[in-house]
Amino acid sequence: MKKIGKRIRNQALKRIYEIPFLQKHADIAYRSAVHNHAINLPSLSATDLTLVETVKQEGVAIASLEALGIPSALKMFDIAKLLMPEIPGIVSGDKNEYVVHATPGQMVENPEIFLWGLEKRILNIAEHYFGLPVAYQGAFYRRDIANMVEHKSRLWHIDTEDRQVFKVIIYLTDVSEDGGPFQYIPRPITEQVVRKLKYKCGYIQDKNMLEALSPSNYRSCRGVSGTVVFAATGSIFHRGKKPVTSDRFAVFFDYTSRLPKYPFFSQYSLPYANLLSFSEQLDRYQLQSLLWQEYVIE
């Protein structure tokens, strides 16, 4: 009952925030914050600047852990691979089940995975994408089951929980076209489809998407184990294509800015006490991204 009450309250607040006058005022404040923060953006290498520009224009950029060369990546990746046998294939028996996540306990027991999302280089890339300080929304370790279910994140959608959403996806297994690749529609084409379908939010069946554009516009992010996908999921239609040959294992690292569009939806991905235990290993910049609710931009 408590969860239902909170959901009803949040939906009511969302409708208030979307009153045109209030929304316009919030949008002006947001643009002003981006403008004012421009001089405070961290420096990036030419390679990372190109990556950010690719994400802004296309919606996605693809790299690899090896090419990124972040020192902690090897240990994180090895630990993530070792966790794979601990993630069950089926847990509920629900015929619509298509994904199993690592439990909060498993994430706490393997902190290297969660903490990798707070690597300064990754935070700096995300900050340049947003133009604002970063809120780290957490790491989500998932096993996508090889079956024919097309539900929720396997349907076309745009992440609308904030103005912009940024994700870093690491494949733990080789992902072929039949292995459940992350799929997207390039940003310029997404914008056309949004207008054509009058899209606001929610999920779109593939048969309905095919009425709006040719499947030749679909892009599949195939890659070997260790492939890294940077995605602006708040600006592009995307989905996880259903895997049919084998289960897909991947870790998703999620980010928004510290100026949320709907602050009442905000919640940490792990218990606060666990986040505090992680904080001992972080500098101030990383800590502010981790405990971002305490450092929201006013």
Question: Could you say what each language-model-derived stretch is?
Answer:
Residues 122-125, 168, 236:
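Alpha-helical packing segments of well-folded alpha/beta enzyme cores
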Residues 161-177, 222-223, 230, 254-257:
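Short, conserved beta-strand element in jelly-roll/cupin
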Residues 10-154:
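Non-heme Fe(II)-dependent double-stranded beta-helix
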Residues 154-160, 236, 240:
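Histidine-centered catalytic micro-motifs
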Residues 79-80, 184-186:
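Short Gly/aromatic-enriched secondary-structure transition segments
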Residues 2, 22, 191-298:
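Conserved double-stranded beta-helix
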Residues 132-135, 158-161, 172-181, 187-190:
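Active-site region of the double-stranded beta-helix
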